[in-house]
Amino acid sequence: LGCFSFQNSKHITSGEGGAITGNNEDLLDRCNSFHNCGRAAGSFHGQGYFTRGSNYRMQHFQAAMLLQQLDKLVKETEVRRKNADYLSANLQQIRGVTPARLPKDSRAVWHLYPLRYDAAQFSGLPRAAFMRALRAEGVPCSGVYHEQYYDGLLNEAIESHGFQRLFSRERLKAYRDSLQELTGNQLVCSTTVGLPQNLLLGQRR
């Protein structure tokens, strides 16, 4: 299964919502049932006419907006790629700013253009101050992602009755402690500056 978001920052958007695609008819029928209030779908009937589900049906107006945007998706993706290549070639000349490197023989659609910021090359200027300076020049940017295992949701799950029934206290503690070892993730989250995808649709000059 593949999952796609149509939230308002995405390449094609309906404001909110998303889509699931796949080549497993049984799984797709289950997804269809779940998003349609648990009603039977295809070969999936649950324990009767209704099974567990909710109303996640997309409205026709949203679908029409999305279908119209498909016509320009390929062209806009190519524009993003060319502008990202141009931007990377120029940013590589600036010490302290490192564009994202793509694996060989891969292509990016650039939902986000990330770069690594090295404060040491800017006399210790904090990343937040660097981003404020970019915004002052009309360049939208953000710190993008943070370490989501610190936002309370994980602790809530670990401390829940369900988790504590399934796993021993020792195992849950070991899992929580293991998160302190994700130093690479912490480095990326603290040094990345992200440019939004719509910036790559603009003119170079």
Residue locations for each model-derived region?
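Conserved PLP-binding catalytic core of the aspartate aminotransferase-like
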Residues: 100-177
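Active-site region of PLP-dependent enzymes
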Residues: 1-112
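PLP-dependent enzyme catalytic core of the Aspartate aminotransferase-like
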Residues: 123, 160-205
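Structured helix-beta-strand junction loops
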Residues: 93-94, 137, 191
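Short beta-strand-to-loop capping motifs
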Residues: 22, 115-119, 197-199
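Alpha-helical membrane insertion/targeting regions
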Residues: 85-88, 125, 148, 152-153, ...
